[in-house]
Amino acid sequence: MVKVLVLYVFHKFNDSVDHFFKHCIFRDENIDFLIIANDINFKFNLVNLPEYVMTMVRKNIGRDFGGWSEGLLKDQLYEKYDKFIFANSTIMGPFIKDNTRWTDYYINGLQDNIKLFGSTINNAYHSHVQTYIFSLDKEALAYLIEIGKFSITKYLRSAREAQNNEILISKDITDKGWNIGCLLKCYQGIDFTFKNKAKKDYGDKLHTDIMYEKYRNVLWNEYEVVFIKGNRIKVTSSLIR
C-alpha cells in the first residue's frame, strides 16, 4: 500500500488550527499526520491530539517551508513514505459532500505525469500550484530536496522569498518535464509544461490568483477545491463536513 505523510504547519494557534485538529485528522494505517508548530513555546499537551499524531515544536525559522523541511528531513522521515501532502494554517475545510477522505483528492491527483498537485494554480508569472495545500510524490520531493527547495541549512527569510519559492518549485517540476495539476475543473487536461501549446495560446482561460471571494461561485466553489484560504474567505461552518 502507498504510505502517505501529511505535514501541517502553523505558527500561531487560532480557530483555523483548532478546526484542522478537530475535523481534518483521522486514523488510517497508511496515512500519518505530522503537526509542526513554528513556535518554540507551544504546548501540544494542551490541545489533546490523538496519540497516533506526530508533533514537532521548533523556532519560527524559514516560514512554512522551514517547518515542512525540518519535518521531512529530521531523521530522514520522508524516506518512509511514498506520497506527501503539505498544508499551512490558512486552509479551511474540507468541503466534501460524500464520505471521500479529503486526502484522497490530493493523492489521486498525482497520476500520469503530474508530480505536484494542489487545490488551485495561479498563472501569474510562471504557472504554479499555490502552496497553502499541495501534494508531491516521492520522486518529485527527492528532486526538490536535492536542489535545495526543501532544506534545513538554507532557510527562507522574507515573504518575498517564500512567494518566490512557491513559484519556483512548480517551475522546477515543469522544467524537469513533469506536469503540475489542481482541482479546478477548468484546468483539467492542461499540460503546464506548455511544450505543445504555448501559454499565450490559452488566452483568458488561464487565470491569476482566484482564491478570493469575488471569484467564488463564478470560477470555483468550495466543493470543487475542497479547501479554501480561510484567511481571505469566510464561510459558515455548516458548509464544512
Locations of the language-model features?
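ER/Golgi luminal nucleotide-sugar-dependent glycosyltransferases, focusing on the catalytic module
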Residues: 1-241
